[in-house]
Amino acid sequence: MQLTNYTEYALRVLLFLGALDEEEKTNIKDIAAAFSISEHHLSKIVYELGKLGYIETIRGRNGGIRLAKRPAEIVIGAVVRETEENLSLVECFAAHGNECVLTPVCRLRFALHEALEAFLRVLDAYTLADLLEDRASLRSLLKERRG
C-alpha cells in the first residue's frame, strides 16, 4: 500500500504544526520550505485540512496556521481515510470500472481487503500526540530546515 503524496504531505503538515508551541502559528511558506514542497500544492492541502477541522487558519496581520484540535484528538487512520482519494488496492475494489473476470469467484479480493483494514486499524491506534513524543527533536530538525 502506498499513500499518495497528498496524504503524506497532509500528515507532514500536521506533524509540523504539532511541533509548534501550543498557541504558536506558522504559514504555508515556512512549511513548504521545511519540506521542499510547492506552496501552491500545500495551500490545497492546508485548505482541506481546515475544512476537515484539523487545522485553523487565521487571517490578518497576526494570522497564520495552527492545529484546531489537541494532538491527542487527531487519529492518524482518520486523517488517511479523509485525505486519501482512493483506497482501492486493486481494480475489483472500485465501485465502477471493475472489468476483472475473476471478481465473482476471487478470494484474493477478500484477502487484500482484510490487509487494507489491518493497515488502517494500525493507523487508528496512533494519534498525532503519539507521533510527537520526541517533539523537541522534531522541532529542532524543522527549525534547521526552515533556515
Curated annotation (Swiss-Prot):
GO cellular component, one term: cytosol
Name under which the protein is recorded: HTH-type transcriptional regulator NsrR
Record function comment: Nitric oxide-responsive transcriptional regulator.
Keywords for the protein's UniProt record, in alphabetical order: 2Fe-2S, DNA-binding, Iron, Iron-sulfur, Metal-binding, Transcription, Transcription regulation
One MF term in the entry's GO annotations: DNA binding
Cofactor(s) for this UniProt protein: [2Fe-2S] cluster
Gene3D superfamilies on file: Winged helix-like DNA-binding domain superfamily/Winged helix DNA-binding domain
One of the Pfam families matching this protein, by short name: Rrf2
Start-end of DNA-binding region: 28-51
Domain HTH rrf2-type: 2-133
NCBIfam families, alphabetized: rrf2_super
Sites where the protein binds [2Fe-2S] cluster: C92, C100, C106
Co-factor binding comment: Binds 1 [2Fe-2S] cluster per subunit.
Taxonomic lineage from the root: Bacteria, Bacillati, Bacillota, Bacilli, Bacillales
